[in-house]
Amino acid sequence: MIRWGISANNHNAALAVFDGDVLKFAGESERFSKIKNDSDLNSQIIDYARSWGDPSEIYWFETPYKKSLRQLIAGQGFVSNNVKKYLQKYNISGKIKTTDHHRSHAAAGYYTSGYQEACVLVIDAIGEFHSLSMWQGQGDQLELLYNLDYRNSVGLWYSAMTQRCGLKPIEEEYILMGMAALGNPNRLTRDMLDDFIYMPIDDYNNPLQFKENLHRGCQWWRPDLTSQQDLYDIAAATQQIYEMLLERILQFALTKTSSRNLVLMGGCALNCAANHLVYKYFQNVWIMPAPGDNGSAIGAVLAHTKKHINWPGVYIGYDM
């Protein structure tokens, strides 16, 4: 049976092809369209995927009605997330199955890790209603241990600070991470903590809580900081606080699991400057090479099949 996993209509669209339980192909739309971080599918990637045959089943990386409800509650207005209608634009038909956004992330990481048991940690900007989730992987099962709602999203906050520095949110966070090396992290860290984050020192039932709803960004914060060095210092403080919060989340994870294996997923797993911290708390670490929404094209399928696969390596996409 040919199964397609799809992550699209969001950012970094991707498509994965499974023949039975074997991953045959996974690629991002941008490789075919040449549009950086392309959010949509295109005829080229679809035609390439069809070389393995038309899909009998299609697996979508998130649950559309939950996403629409959250957008409505957050004041974004009603946004249509009709998957069937979206796929019809590309002449894609087949039985459509959906899964929750964070479960797709968790499945993409755990079932490719090679671990038979692991703590799975997903940190991103937002997925339906959640921004942080912790899972216990045991054998072929993934059990949700904890989740944190999007109003307390460390990923959304990092994206808001990316925008505050004049960069494109949900795309140019890597630039902010690089800018941090040029700034003084101590100049603004205290002010930033005071203005944004409530972090009770001993409350490990609540790893973090934000004072502001960052859905609409934080352009209002410290409008007096406009020079290039100011922006470097904002970046440095942001990165330093992110690393503080990551350590707090890792410490919190250890209260939920005794595993020494960690699977780290979600867009925040791309913060390579901070990832060294995970080895302070876990012995073995797997970060799937596409931990963001692109990798959820694979995870959408694995969340349903619930089977470990032989990870074929990173060269499973576009033929160079």
Where are these regions (language model features)?
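Short acidic/glycine-rich loops and adjacent helix/strand connectors
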Residues: M1-M320
